[in-house]
């Protein structure tokens, strides 16, 4: 099992992954900007649809599932798409538009109070920690923040990428001036901005033992034990134990690799 999610998943993953099960030498051609799609051999019908919240998790997960024998013969193709978490609708759940997705229980309950009729929990993810990570050690005070730039995710529904860092500033009595907050679409853009000096610190998440890139001397913990949510599967497919175990294996491999890379 993992010691942290991703995504938020957030994300936010988000994530060029390296620890997926070994794939065929020739990858399948994949789809448009917000979607990765590939055919499955055999006589299956319909599409196995996966919803993630980060582009960086989509392609490697699609490549893994496109070579997965457990899906061959049952489905005609695999489609992995990503979108902002706020775009998931009650209709998406009740019409079973996705066979696999990440989210949090309270979000799904808010959309469809009886969502368990449509989705079953497949893989619960452990809590994680949120930090401010700087080019220099982070001190959270009005004086230290003066003239500094903080990188956040532009997704206002992201706990780790948006809400918790702003809560931390508010708790410290810090009122950012115009231009001190910089917003980015993905976590890899945050990390790149920090490395180039475009921002002075960013919001970050890390798991002990899984993030060799993370420098604790330059990080300030702002929230511990943040619920990471879970992966959910179409309740009709959850009865297939072999398929469920296969999907868990792919998800764990993908997220483990994700943790070893910069957010």
Task: List each language-model region with its residue ranges.
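Structural motif
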Residues: 51-56, 103-105, 135, 154-156, ...
């Amino acid at each position: 099992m993992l010691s942290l999610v991703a995504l938020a998943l957030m994300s936010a993953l988000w994530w060029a992954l390296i620890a997926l099960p070994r794939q065929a030498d020739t990858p399948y051609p994949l789809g448009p900007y917000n979607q990765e799609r590939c055919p499955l051999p055999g006589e299956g019908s319909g599409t196995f649809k996966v919803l993630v919240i980060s582009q960086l998790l989509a392609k490697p997960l699609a490549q893994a599932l496109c070579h997965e024998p457990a899906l061959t013969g049952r489905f005609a193709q695999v489609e992995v798409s990503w979108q902002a978490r706020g775009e998931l609708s009650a209709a998406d759940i009740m019409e079973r538009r996705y066979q696999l997705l990440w989210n949090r229980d309270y979000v799904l309950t808010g959309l469809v109070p009886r969502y368990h009729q449509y989705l079953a929990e497949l893989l619960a993810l452990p809590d994680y920690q949120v930090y401010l990570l700087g080019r220099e050690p982070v001190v959270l005070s009005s004086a230290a923040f003066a003239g500094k730039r903080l990188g956040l995710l532009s997704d206002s529904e992201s706990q780790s990428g948006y809400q918790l860092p702003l809560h931390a500033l508010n708790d410290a009595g810090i009122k950012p001036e115009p231009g001190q907050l910089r917003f980015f679409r993905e976590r890899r853009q945050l990390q790149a901005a920090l490395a180039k000096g475009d921002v002075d610190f960013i919001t970050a998440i890390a798991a002990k033992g899984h993030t060799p890139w993370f420098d604790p001397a330059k990080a300030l913990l702002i929230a511990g034990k943040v619920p990471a949510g879970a992966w959910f599967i179409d309740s009709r497919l959850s009865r297939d134990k072999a398929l469920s175990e296969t999907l868990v294996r792919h998800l764990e491999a993908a997220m483990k690799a994700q943790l070893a890379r910069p957010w």
